[in-house]
Amino acid sequence: MAVLTKIETPLGTVIASSDGQSLTGLWFEGQKYECAFVEDAVWDDSLPLWKNVKQALEDYFQGVDDVASAVPIAFVGGTPFQKAVWAVLTEIPSQTVWTYKDVAERVGEKLGRKTSSRAVGTAIGRNPISLFVPCHRVVATTGALTGYAGGVERKRALLILEGHSVVKDRVMKGERHET
């Protein structure tokens, strides 16, 4: 059974899901695929994990570099391929962007076979644990801010928060925006 709660952030309300031990989902309210893979859920704000999730989110929005390791995560849904893609996303260092091609190459190395950027993009779009599995750090080869289930406006805001220079919905490579 999944346990759910709502948490306010500077970019809107998020819905968090847990199996009681780990964070299994984090979606901006109303985003595409909200609460995907959640079945038999109960709302409970008293789960001890929520304190750590809330603190990690506060730290993140105050500019702390890497908060993802502060909270255990688990992928409870998805295909083996999707889980492989999501696991690779956790390897993207803070203040860094990778392209869909970069992610596809890394997933291909792990799976021992070629993987297309398009297939990777589809899996990234279904990422159930926003922010902690940083899919917002993946951009097109041109630097364009393509796709984000929480909305491109949020993707832009998250990348700027992390210090990237974003002009006309494109990350400017090699340029950092000082916050």
Regions found by a protein language model. Give the residues of each.
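N-terminal positioning helix adjacent to the helix-turn-helix/winged-helix DNA-binding module
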Residues: 81-85, 116, 154
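A short, Lys/Arg-enriched interface patch at domain edges and termini
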Residues: 150-166
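Short, positively charged loop/turn segments that connect secondary-structure elements
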Residues: 108-122
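Basic nucleic-acid-binding alpha-helical/helix-turn surface characteristic of O6-alkylguanine DNA
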Residues: 1-111, 161-179
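Major-groove DNA-recognition helix of helix-turn-helix-type DNA-binding domains
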Residues: 123-125, 132
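Charged low-complexity interaction tracts in eukaryotic proteins
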Residues: 130-149
